[in-house]
Amino acid sequence: MPAMVPGWNHGNITRSKAEELLSRAGKDGSFLVRASESIPRAYALCVLFRNCVYTYRILPNEDDKFTVQASEGVPMRFFTKLDQLIDFYKKENMGLVTHLQYPVPLEEEDAIDEAEEDTVESVMSPPELPPRNIPMSAGPSEAKDLPLATENPRAPEVTRLSLSETLFQRLQSMDTSGLPEEHLKAIQDYLSTQLLLDSDFLKTGSSNLPHLKKLMSLLCKELHGEVIRTLPSLESLQRLFDQQLSPGLRPRPQVPGEASPITMVAKLSQLTSLLSSIEDKVKSLLHEGSESTNRRSLIPPVTFEVKSESLGIPQKMHLKVDVESGKLIVKKSKDGSEDKFYSHKKILQLIKSQKFLNKLVILVETEKEKILRKEYVFADSKKREGFCQLLQQMKNKHSEQPEPDMITIFIGTWNMGNAPPPKKITSWFLSKGQGKTRDDSADYIPHDIYVIGTQEDPLGEKEWLELLRHSLQEVTSMTFKTVAIHTLWNIRIVVLAKPEHENRISHICTDNVKTGIANTLGNKGAVGVSFMFNGTSLGFVNSHLTSGSEKKLRRNQNYMNILRFLALGDKKLSPFNITHRFTHLFWLGDLNYRVELPTWEAEAIIQKIKQQQYSDLLAHDQLLLERKDQKVFLHFEEEEITFAPTYRFERLTRDKYAYTKQKATGMKYNLPSWCDRVLWKSYPLVHVVCQSYGSTSDIMTSDHSPVFATFEAGVTSQFVSKNGPGTVDSQGQIEFLACYATLKTKSQTKFYLEFHSSCLESFVKSQEGENEEGSEGELVVRFGETLPKLKPIISDPEYLLDQHILISIKSSDSDESYGEGCIALRLETTEAQHPIYTPLTHHGEMTGHFRGEIKLQTSQGKMREKLYDFVKTERDESSGMKCLKNLTSHDPMRQWEPSGRVPACGVSSLNEMINPNYIGMGPFGQPLHGKSTLSPDQQLTAWSYDQLPKDSSLGPGRGEGPPTPPSQPPLSPKKFSSSTANRGPCPRVQEARPGDLGKVEALLQEDLLLTKPEMFENPLYGSVSSFPKLVPRKEQESPKMLRKEPPPCPDPGISSPSIVLPKAQEVESVKGTSKQAPVPVLGPTPRIRSFTCSSSAEGRMTSGDKSQGKPKASASSQAPVPVKRPVKPSRSEMSQQTTPIPAPRPPLPVKSPAVLQLQHSKGRDYRDNTELPHHGKHRQEEGLLGRTAMQ
């Protein structure tokens, strides 16, 4: 069938890909046909003429005849087939810009190689290394039946006879004296005649063996009756000793059924499970005492041993968290009496230290309404995290809010290797194993939602679902509700939720996309589930991408296809793919990206794994490298990988990797790799934190290890306005000002904007913008003051500030989208203009940028405090030291890894955002310190795949400002004013590349001179001034040498996806002074539909080194200390000033004049102000990268 498709029909390729293919062809009259992106069943005819691409829309009518859309008055011609239409327009002067001459063929693909590999892998999997030796499951899949049905078709009778005779001989050699005579006769009858009949069933493709089932039913007839009679007694005994049974749970009624083998297996499994669990429950009951019988599915009290300083002396303390009673109990000894306790209402905030990962500050309110600051040191960071999670659970459980504003989500992915799972898989759901794992103290905290994705899953849906629910009940003592289950062949996704959330979940949607052989067979692909949780949209995608280390590009294409064709979420958001349809999108699965190293380094790789030198291997991880190059998972995030590669193990052990695999084409190498991954993407300024990311160590039936990840995710409730619809203060308004889009296209068609949001009654369409020429290959579309004012359905700030506006820029001729973005409405202040920015993407590719200003008008009111505001992260001097360490790192991956991850580089402070995806604003829109705006000649093309900086002042969805931790949204209200670090105003510093570090240091010195606290020196000792002694020139150069070690970052002008948006007055000045400012269109010009220009020489404009002189700040290489300065002299005076020694002072040791001069010089104090210049902390205004998230 593929031969029937004409070579010029490229199907569902993107518009940008079509332009690329035609530009590559380079001949006038080259053409191709692609599917329309805006109209179903329509096509787009793309023609190249004089290095320009012209696009004509081919529309079907009611009779399925095709016609080329023409201007008014032009007669329309209809064709029954596309071939006829193309042949007609190959003639000259038929109305096109030129006649069709040279069809652009499809790109060659190695589909045969992939098909051969997949077929060989499925057929030859049993003898591959390591040997599987896995029993067949009760319900074999079609893939398993295929080898049996096609095996040796030329001599079926000989095979059957030999098999029957062999089995008879084996039966005769066995001791059958203990078998009942009727059972023995039934077995012999089956081997003599019925075995052949079952073989015929297999030959027809059926997976059913009716005669074997009949034989087993006969053999188990008496056993079935005995099990039915025994099970109720055992269940009653189990309930008697079950202290965690929910009160409404009743025993299942025993329905007598047929004694089938499947029923017997289930009953026997239930029987053995009951026998083993009864003994465990009795032991637990005797150990815990009778009082535990009243504790059903409650979280037991957990005690933490901590240290607390009193008058400088560390003392051991014990903190007991009782979630159910809502108390934090402080005791001096574990078994002693309570010294004091604090109720959940009196515990105001938890503040984590970044310098000491096991230190925690607890702010509590006393009876006299005073706020106390209690500092405790835990045994390790995991204990601290477990304590924080328990207290957060306590606050959530006793919250007065009827609806949650934060939920926890478990994500699990496992390639089961076509093997049945082990009986016990609870470690997976407890996040136990390698990597970032959960503490034991958090075991009793159930997650709100469990999402489990599997690949090569041999079980049926019911069997797998029963195992999952049984395992979760064992872990949480809760029976979870099934939200959705969806399967594409052996790729499956299951979503389970707490029973209490049943009425909060709605709009459930499932879909799948096949990306296997010829995109028709389901051996590879993806399954997805989406739903609404109150007012928040959630999406989950489980994918199994093409295998093979050399198939990296095909995996990228798999991802793009899934992105385009997976139909989930709100159907009204048709211009947007799944990356913009959901507040939170989680992508999991066997992505099959490998560690790209030579095969002869296999043993060296294994040695690095044993030594846990994962960073050396991650530098060659295909997925991280492809994301760095912006080729896949654009704007997604992934938690830091701290666990061993999850593929390819020998089965039944995790101590040995099996990296060789015998194929029909020869030996194949599968180097140990992180094939199984979890990534996520959330809307701007939405709370999301990854709490764990790792793999299990005790589930070994597959050659993959299961991977787990857990998240805190912010959610919103279904909001009902407190204001009446006619009241004056309920008139909200969203106004966009001075907006413009920069697009990577040569099309001269007009463009308009569409605004979509759940806070709008329907989408809003703008007028056409004015086109201006940008740099090479770019078009600037300005919308000025013509954009419509948006009217939200609810104007309460508590609702509106949590909303987002989706933007799509579309062609007026074809209505096809050229880019989509997202703007957050969470602004520092309303009634004022704020700068906004969002990258524009289309089908997973970067297509441009959208900039402008926004003004939001809301009704009276304020936002309430969120539950995730309860836990903060305190910034201290550790952030600077750690980032300086990163600056000198030789690890190439450090140059683009995120700096927001704790404890890597400290940018997550009380006023910063751990969530790297998004940016915040400066306080009330004020300009930020350490900022330098690019000159117009540095603002080059906004379309660049060059490496981007990690963090910046601009990020998706907002304007300028430093990152803000997700644990504290910018508008979170405060119940109190504490003296914690950074609570007051402090200078904020943007991130700078190593190359720009000198400029930022100079700016920081001036800022710190103005904000630094004064200190008095003790005259009996040496100066504590931060000014250095006279040192050799080489030592003065040391900071600069350190900055040269990492690979250089690109020029600020090249990474233009993050060019800073100047303020309004700056925009005007740029218009008037810049030579590159685009010239406005003076008058209307005739335009041809979808006129698209391209050039064979598509070189990107680059600029020379625009870096300015960088002042050397040698003081930054040491820890300076401030001194008291009664009078602030000028810099020239400081260099000459000497201070006389006061007369009343006693005689002092003689000091040199240099010491006296330095003693009265103003230095920088990093002890109180931690804004150290370091890599990953200061950035130019560039596009923002997430935690391992690439723009």
UniProtKB/Swiss-Prot annotation:
Segments for region (Interaction with DAB2): 1015-1029
Entry annotated with the keyword Transmembrane: no
GO biological process: apoptotic process; determination of adult lifespan; immunoglobulin mediated immune response; intracellular signal transduction; negative regulation of B cell activation; negative regulation of B cell proliferation; negative regulation of bone resorption; negative regulation of cell population proliferation
Effect of mutating residue 1021 to F: Strongly impairs function, tyrosine phosphorylation, subcellular location and interaction with DOK1
Induction: By activin/TGF-beta (at protein level). Regulated by the Smad pathway. Isoform 3 is expressed during myeloid development.
Oligomeric and partner information: Interacts with tyrosine phosphorylated form of SHC1. Interacts with tyrosine phosphorylated form of DOK1. Interacts with tyrosine phosphorylated form of DOK3. Interacts with tyrosine phosphorylated form of SLAMF1/CD150. Interacts with PTPN11/SHP-2 in response to IL-3. Interacts with receptor EPOR. Interacts with receptors MS4A2/FCER1B and FCER1G. Interacts with receptors FCGR2B and FCGR3. Interacts with receptor FCGR2A, leading to regulate gene expression during the phagocytic process. Interacts with GRB2. Interacts with PLCG1. Interacts with tyrosine kinases SRC and TEC. Interacts with CRKL.
Protein name, entry field: Phosphatidylinositol 3,4,5-trisphosphate 5-phosphatase 1
Organism from which the protein derives: Mus musculus (Mouse)
Taxonomic path: Eukaryota, Metazoa, Chordata, Craniata, Vertebrata
Gene from which the chain derives: Inpp5d
